[in-house]
């Protein structure tokens, strides 16, 4: 039996989520519904502009893969996370918040610098817009990816955002190769249509000879496979992933388990905040399959979890909600 169910790699960010208006986004030149990488100066400008926006502010450790690992841990999976923080106040907050969720963080002592931050701006239509300053996360190295702990894991899971620069692409590629050589199953999320379109070469470099499991939404699937229909995208994904999951928002999700397709309808819910839905889905799905469930069961479970997170503000749900979702599925 392995020490960990899932070993995650990704950005280590402190997420600050806040409700804004469409007018605020337009006034400050923020592209709605997108994840935009910004420098420290731009983020400071937005922080100052947001000081007057005091409605529903939430702060938590974050980053896409981090959110998924926290979700999997909260359902009961054994988890480890590799990311890079600085020795500042935000870095301390990140580690404390992550550990509180039951996730083990790497043991490399942080250095001086600035911990990455993500401003998540949610408009009344529940759409989330992210402006991210990666900070220390950009300096992720092979050191944070503790090989002994990775080898002791069932699965490696990483976010596609890692491929947005060459240095972290190499870290991700090496981790993938190490995992394969040591019998660790590999999983990756395509993360964002922008990432898939602009950094397709880096993504292909990391995926290499193929992954055991790939997560994406329909737009990402169409973009990465250069397809016009979902059917064509499904055929294209079969050449790079042994299994995969395509989320389709309100329509639910489709998965390929290596031999056949499975699908699950969307769970009817009133969307309050879509931030974290995809991350929650991936975390819940990974928890399900590491617990021995099949892909159809995992789809239904992950759909229910994602619906629960979009029905409230913030990418996290209360501890009791994880128990309620499990009870819904008799576990």
Cite the ranges covered by each PLM segment:
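Conserved phosphate-binding/catalytic region of the ribokinase-like
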Residues: 1-7, 12-13, 19, 27-37, ...
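Anion (oxyanion) recognition and catalysis
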Residues: 73, 99, 180-181, 238
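A short, aliphatic-rich alpha-helical micro-motif
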Residues: 149-151, 207-208, 238
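Short beta-strand scaffold segments in enzyme catalytic cores
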Residues: 117-121, 252-255
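Conserved beta-alpha-beta core of the PfkB/ribokinase-like small-molecule kinase fold
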Residues: 155-232, 251-252
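Substrate-binding N-lobe of the ribokinase-like
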Residues: 43-117, 134, 328-331
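Hydrophobic beta-strand scaffold residues
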Residues: 79, 105, 186-187, 244
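Conserved phosphate-binding/catalytic loop of the ribokinase/pfkB sugar-kinase fold
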Residues: 106-110, 120-160, 165-166
């Amino acid at each position: 039996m392995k020490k960990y169910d899932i070993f995650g790699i990704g950005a280590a960010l402190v997420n600050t989520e806040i409700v804004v208006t469409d007018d605020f986004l337009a006034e400050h030149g923020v592209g709605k519904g997108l994840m935009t990488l910004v420098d420290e100066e731009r983020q400071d400008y937005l922080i100052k502009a947001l000081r007057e926006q005091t409605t529903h502010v939430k702060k938590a450790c974050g980053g896409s893969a981090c959110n998924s690992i926290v979700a999997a841990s909260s359902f009961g999976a054994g988890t480890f996370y590799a990311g890079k923080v600085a020795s500042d106040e935000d870095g301390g907050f990140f580690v404390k918040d992550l550990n509180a969720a039951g996730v083990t963080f790497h043991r490399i002592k942080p250095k001086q610098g600035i911990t990455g931050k993500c401003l998540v701006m949610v408009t009344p239509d529940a759409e989330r817009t992210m402006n991210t300053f990666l900070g220390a996360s950009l300096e992720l190295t092979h050191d944070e990816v503790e090989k002994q702990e990775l080898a002791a894991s069932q699965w490696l899971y990483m976010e596609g955002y890692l491929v947005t620069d060459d240095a972290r692409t190499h870290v991700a590629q090496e981790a993938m190769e190490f995992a394969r050589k040591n019998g660790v199953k590999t999983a990756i999320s395509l993360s964002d249509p922008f990432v898939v379109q602009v950094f397709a070469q880096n993504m292909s470099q990391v995926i290499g000879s193929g992954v055991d499991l790939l997560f994406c939404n329909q737009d990402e699937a169409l973009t990465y496979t250069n397809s016009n229909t979902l059917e064509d995208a499904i055929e294209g994904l079969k050449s790079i992933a042994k299994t995969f999951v395509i989320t389709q928002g309100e329509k639910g999700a489709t998965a390929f388990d290596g031999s056949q397709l499975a699908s699950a309808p969307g769970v009817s819910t009133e969307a309050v905040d879509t931030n974290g839905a995809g991350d929650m889905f991936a975390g819940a799905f990974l928890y399900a399959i590491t617990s021995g469930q099949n892909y159809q069961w995992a789809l239904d479970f992950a759909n229910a979890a994602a619906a629960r997170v979009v029905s409230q503000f913030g990418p996290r749900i209360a501890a009791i909600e994880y128990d309620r979702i499990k009870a819904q599925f008799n576990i």
